[in-house]
Amino acid sequence: MTVAQVIKPEPMAPSPTGFEPRIVAFVCKWCTYAGADLAGTSRMTYPPNVRTLMLPCTGRIDVSFVVRAFLQGADGVIVSGCHPGDCHYTAGNYRARRRWTLLRDLLDTLGVDLARFDLAWISAAEGAKWVKTIQSLTDKIKKLGPYESMHRLAADRTPDIAPRIESDLLFQVASQDGNTAPASPELVTAVSEALSSGHAKVVVGWTRSDTLSRPRPSWITTPEAARSLVEPSGSGNLARLLKNPHLRRILPLGIVARSSEVLSLNVLAQEAQVDPASIVVFAVADDGQFRGMVDLATASTTMLQNLPADRPVGFSDAVFKALDELMAKPPAERWEFWMEQSAKCIKCYACRGSCPMCGCDQCFTDKNQPQWFPTAADGPGNFAWHLLRAFHLAGRCVGCGACQAACPARIPLNVLSAAMARSALKHFGHQAGLDPKGTSLQSDFKPNDQEDFIL
């Protein structure tokens, strides 16, 4: 049975009390589903508004399930599973807990009504707790009424043919000043010698473009080509070129790296997407000073010093100021803001192409068996794309701003990413890219992770 079948049942007779909410429950097979079954066999009663979907473990409940449920007409969603320490798969609920912490903060940033999204630990012996939880959620949503704003979004299936692109308060244009000054002699010499000696077989850097008014990312393989390098002033992130499977086979690989590229390389190393031993870093400080040819560990030590500890690294002060201004607004205003921004999206995927972290073999938007979300640039398609992309980058985005600079619709993507980075730091003390030997945020957990929002 599919999610759509569960939350689109046969028409029910009109309720004598008026509005009857539709609630979708994603539950663990071993605990909560058994608890709900116990409630039934014990002849306990609770509202029939809930449609229950059983999955093997809460660790299997993807955030896309929650998004899909809301877009398919649910007025409320609840996720429930085993208590910590009782998971039949050892740590599935621990991983789920970290995932839901991040998702709640993302939904709050977007202005989604968090009162409609509950999480609970319910064991197989807690049939009474299941009844109480469903009764409480149903009563709460009845008071809130239908989720009209989400229903309107889900019904918006007509893409805007000519989206209106205007300057926004929260949008900040990344530097694209067209600087094509030649690279420093020290950098050119170091790259040339590395290619001559075999310390690097290919070097990724910035070169002058004959057609663009700004540097372009390129890779060179001969010592003579090193003279074509220019100062690394482009707004993109050179680490994204490492997504190229052909380039990644040419090892050892050199890269002209600023702090944003070093952070990105560390994240890729954490995820075993690159081998630090095969990477040669031509370190360039953010002020343009060449720091020498070093390995990734040394580059991390020398270039990531004196970073602020009170906010995520990589993001500018202006981005966090914009985020703070947004979060000071009521949820309804935040929702309207992001709906206006999302409506401008033309689904060109320039944000995906410019991001060194977006490297899946097949993006969820390209999957059509099944097709979970609309591919058109319509209301639900754009909303799901930006929400899930931001979530997938939680704990991974280094704040380089390449996505925002590449966006032709001028959507403030870095603000969403900053919200996720702040959530990762606040709840888990995680800073993306500081340690190449660290653990990826969403693949890790701690038994004492926050759970005060779980029933």
Language-model region placement:
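Iron-sulfur-associated redox domains of electron-transfer enzymes in respiratory
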Residues: 1-344, 353-356
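Ferredoxin-type iron-sulfur electron-transfer modules in oxidoreductases and energy-metabolism complexes
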Residues: 107-109, 322-342, 360-455
